Amino acid sequence: MNQPEVELEDLGLIDYKQCWDYQTKLFDASVQLKIKNRKFPENRVSTKNHLIFCEHPHVYTLGKSGDLKNLLIDGPKRKEKNISFYKINRGGDITYHGPGQLVVYPILDLDYFFSDIHKYLRLLEESVILTLADYGVTGQRLDGFTGVWVDAEKETPRKICAIGVKCSRWVTMHGIGFNINSNLDYFKHIVPCGIEDKSCLLYTSDAADEGL
């Protein structure tokens, strides 16, 4: 069986809402095409797979099951610091995106790969763990939580990559936020992912220097 093609796009630094709208356009096109293919299988057209790389200006996003109490900074202070905020349609709680963080949005039709959202999440984690390993950093999973951590076996594990997705008819959107050279001060204004007793970590200034 031939491997499905995936189109890669590097959007650079892009406004969160602009990128979210673009994701939604691609996602909706695939979902609607799958609905049409089911109704008219004789005229079936293949869906397209996309892998979007980008960075965002400072923004907090709250997932559909998130708790607004985990946003610790009010509107006037966000405006003063030039931080946007959006309630969005992915899973998970609150997170931060900003310059120095690699954001990856896979818009994939999982019917080409496997129909298992839990496997998909674990493979997203694995892609980050393997990337970190290439640079001598040990990334790990933490039981009961989605994402990638360092010091997972210690009392205060630190999160280096957050993951939150949406999936409908086995089409995915949203994805990962990988802290490479982010300003971690922005995480002080939220309870990241709604987890009070954990902290966040950078790849460059923390993990690499410590040789984790």
Residue ranges of model-derived segments:
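A hydrophobic, small-residue-rich beta->alpha segment in the mid-to-C-terminal subdomain
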Residues: 181-205
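Single conserved hydrophobic/aromatic residue that forms the stacking wall/gate
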Residues: 206-212
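N-terminal lobe of the biotin/lipoate ligase/transferase fold
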Residues: 1-157
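Histidine/acidic-rich helix-loop-helix segments that form or flank divalent-metal centers
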Residues: 160-163
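Conserved phosphate/anionic-ligand binding catalytic regions in large, soluble enzymes, centered on
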Residues: 171, 176-179
